[in-house]
């Protein structure tokens, strides 16, 4: 009787075991594919100032210089691939491309040091424990901190922002929702040095952003413009979204990710509530397609949403997906699922759906195509008429990160993120 009961229970567990095995194979196949694509890209990416970013009209890889906001994603992708393969050649390439960015540790001209340094040197330190990398990261955190202003309670994003409504309207203390992503560098610096000033800067910025960047339903504004003298909000606008009052898809993705990460680092329940609210808003939108890959803005062409007169969104009817937003959101939701109890299944299931969509032929390029980038159909900025329906290096990075997080959950049921 005991044998029969045991056999019956074993039969019950077979479907779950098969599904888990199939999902592990799915992750493995995609990581093997990533290794092939990145190996091909390494042949084309030559020179110290040619960090892969997107493709040109002929479908060839286009690089950018180190002081752009995106150079950290390519070496970060190499590190994720090395982590999976253990390939020493990939580690050598990751090391080389990372160390090219060392001068950025002293860069103070914009806020993106988190993307630039933490995606590259952060992964490098995580996988090698090289003390020199830690020192570079701490110095980068010091450089980022110079852009914090106590009057606004924020880290200044760009040095100025020109409104899409009026070319004469220029704001001198813009803060964009993307900036939440750079706080991880500050939290890291406090963790490894014990200097709480980085932590205080990060949570002050997070609190100010939570107060001013969100509507009551947890949808986000893209750009908040502060008066640098009084610290008060002057305007709530968009740079890359459809309209000032719309919700730019990648901006909402940054928000979900940023507050999930901030909860991880602080364990403050306000940030968890915020991250869940932002994720719930995202997933419940009627404009979100069934494959969970959003259009570039959740409110394009909807009544009550009007682009600024200078924005290219005024003169185009393009309805395009932004696969980069889905990649970022998938990675964030895998993490958020681990903090959310019973709600976690909703977030994990959505992340799995996004990941499978991105890995489908609709979004994942054939080997050797797409300029050797992995993910197709991304949008940089329609208002600026740039990078429209192209691959983007950060879509690949967060696709890889989401795969790694899913792999950890399949193997261990939990994430190891520090």
Where are these regions (language model features)?
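Glycan-recognition and catalytic cores of secretory/periplasmic carbohydrate-active enzymes
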Residues: 20-418
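Bacterial Sec-dependent N-terminal signal peptides
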Residues: 1-25
